[in-house]
Design a protein with these regions (language model features):
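N-terminal catalytic or cofactor-binding beta/alpha core of small enzyme domains
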Residues: 1-173
């Protein structure tokens, strides 16, 4: 189910409440994507913003504009904590949902699936930001990711980051 910013804010606050109730040791954000492809920069931009603003040592951010996380290197991530709650963040394509919408899925995500890449699902939940249309064609999808609207993705990433940063203020790890 896709969500407006208000709905995303509500749903993400429910996630933080669940993390508080279950007593996880750490909160880890895996921000997937690359700054080399505009449409795939949603995760790294969020990672960059979170890294600059998160001061709690129990909240870790993996993946940003300098250190990209992708379907190849994701399997090498080490959490170095006992019982983390992992939130993966990535760009997504959709043939029915307009770019600029966001949704939370209650399972991990498989990075690179829009380009038929094989990887292991990662995360307790995932935040997916729709950045372009899914054409059901590898070549067209790659083209859509390369030519996505940078201003939309930058604004979109900043708004989602702001909601995340406001919500994690209520985290009790």
């Amino acid at each position: 189910k896709y969500q407006s910013y208000a709905n995303f804010n509500f749903e993400f606050n429910k996630v933080i409440k669940r993390v508080n109730e279950k007593r996880y040791s750490d909160l880890i954000f895996i921000c997937i994507g690359t700054n080399k492809i505009v449409g795939d920069s949603f995760g790294p931009i969020i990672g960059e913003i979170l890294k600059r603003n998160v001061k709690d040592r129990k909240i870790k951010v993996i993946g940003d504009l300098t250190n990209n996380i992708n379907s190849k290197n994701i399997k090498n991530i080490k959490y170095n904590c006992d019982n983390p709650y992992v939130i993966s963040i990535d760009s997504a394509l959709s043939d029915t949902i307009e770019p600029g919408n966001v949704f939370i899925i209650k399972k991990g995500l498989v990075p690179g699936s829009a380009l038929n890449k094989k990887a292991t699902a990662i995360g307790n939940i995932a935040i997916k930001g729709i950045v372009a249309k899914d054409e059901k064609s590898l070549i067209k999808n790659y083209y859509n990711l390369k030519n996505a609207d940078y201003k939309l993705i930058l604004k979109f990433s900043k708004n989602i980051s702001k909601i995340i940063l406001q919500s994690i203020k209520f985290l009790n790890l």
